[in-house]
Amino acid sequence: MVGAFIMQGSEKMYRFNIKEISKEDALRMIRKYHYSNTLPKINKYFLGFFLDKELVGVVTLGWGTRPRHTIQRIFASLDTKDYLEIGRMCMTEEMPRNSESQMLSQLVKWIHRNIPELKILFTWADGMVGKVGYVYQASNFIYAGYSDGEMYMKDGVKIHVRQMKSFLVPGGQKDSRITVRPTIEQMKKYGILHFKGKQYRLYTGIQIITFWKKRSRCSEFIAVYTGFWCKSYLCGRWD
């Protein structure tokens, strides 16, 4: 089935045809419908969501700039092979407002069928641009704290601090620093804006797995099952 929908109450329930697409096709959609206009550097899957052969949504899966650090902040026993991160997700503007939640639900099922060894699907909600992860909350993702962050923007395009070298270090000149932050004078010269804020961690589970997370005087038991979470607290709380 290429694509279909059924009615449930007053809302359409879409059945997407999900298949891998080229990086170029994904990037065209992202540039048109995603606020960042860019792709993360480490991408493993470019997934297209089709209705009647029309590409209406895109999700990229891969890892961020510090893959191992990211997952081990939540689960110390896991590694990069155990999770994938949603790098970009977007849909055409014609799709109804509940469509992204349906897309996420069907994405989890696609992962369960095609990457059965995966344990965690992870994402960030970019609070610095007013994103607090409503679509992920509606899709049963679990909030896992936040990270203080910063970003730069030039000509309306978000620039990660690790990309600053391309603007500030002359071509051919070696610089051993991982990040290079611009001075006030350089920001004025190149028209770069600087923002500080929070990025929110959210995740959902793909497999049945059990973790013990040690706290000062208590432990927490968390069971994960195909996108639905059951949490049983022995004491303490998850934050």
Locate each region found by the language model.
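Acidic, Ala/Val/Gly-enriched low-complexity intrinsically disordered segments
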Residues: V2-A4, A223
